[in-house]
Amino acid sequence: MTTRKLFALLALAAAIGLFVPALPAPAEAKAFTVGIPLPLTGAEAKFGEMEKQAYEMAVDEINAKGGVNGVKLALDIQDSGGKPETATAIVEKFITINKYPIVVGEYTSQCSYAVAGVCEKYNVPYLVVTGAADKITQQGWKNVFRLNPPASLYNLGVFSFFEQVARPKTIAILYENTDFGNSTSKAMKDYCDSHGVYVVLSEGYQAGAVDFKPILQKVKSLRPDIVYMVSYLMDASLLMRQSKELDINPQAFIGGGAGHTLPEFLQNAAEASEYCMSATLWTPQVKYPGAKEFFDNFKKKFNKEADYHGAEAYAAAYVLADTLKRSKAATSDDLRASLAGTDMMTAFGPVKFVSWGQFTNQNKMDTLVLQVVGKKYETVWPSTAASAKFVYPVPRWRERK
């Protein structure tokens, strides 16, 4: 019996009040499979690997407890290489050949936006998990739901830190020329323009550059209070190493999430990562139910730490399970309706899809500020969520031990 038929029979039985002992036992039912494109190779592979592991860990937990309505979950994870055209082809196959009624995942904003367009075309619901460019949920698409905040809201915690602690007068903004980089840096520039923080430099760069010294020399000559960067892992690491080499000394280096929050950033940037701050959506110190357990179990299982990207993927699997549990049938129409009614707490935080302004089916949540203190990440803002006291202004490079 197919999963779709099984859900339909269960719904019919519930509707007419019948007890149906003759339904197949869970072991006889086929698993419900969800398609997930992810970058498992290429520049974003570290993010894709973490998310893949988090999805799999969550599904193992769900299945160990009997699955969803007695039906096990299965994942069909395919490597997009971080390329929108590849992600599009994968999802076309998911929908037209595999007949999957829902799609979850991807990592970059470009790939997520491309996948969203395909899902809207075929009227199949799509749960965005990490793609952050504002435009993804600004198209009025009825099939696209986003778990993570839009890029323009990533810095809410940083803005609060500026207003209550740092009170900077000048800032330099460096960002990669991607959808995520453009959206996040624009939000920072707009905030600064409206709050009296003078933007001495706002400059994009090609992701994957091998030398940032020309742009960093500009930053050094302008001597801003804050150096703000939106970068993926390798760029974030190189920017910090070369900032140290050039002896650039702002009151703080602050990342816009992404590469500045990965555990590998601490390794790659080494001593240059110390005291670096970043916007983040989640840390293991948050008080959400299951957050610390997820972090500890992930570290035990994979011998490495998860950041907010892993927490997003882990939570997305539970959102999927909740959606299936409440759905009348495993069809795209029913799953879309069920997804729209989501209102739950996860290890990543609250999930409820709402519409406001230009956003449609968008989750809302608070954001945080972390800082590398003593060679490890600590939550430093807001103070109510802090695991350590922030260091601001940061010591000059030559004053550090």
Name each model-derived stretch.
Residues 2-19, 23-401:
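Extracytosolic ligand-binding ectodomains
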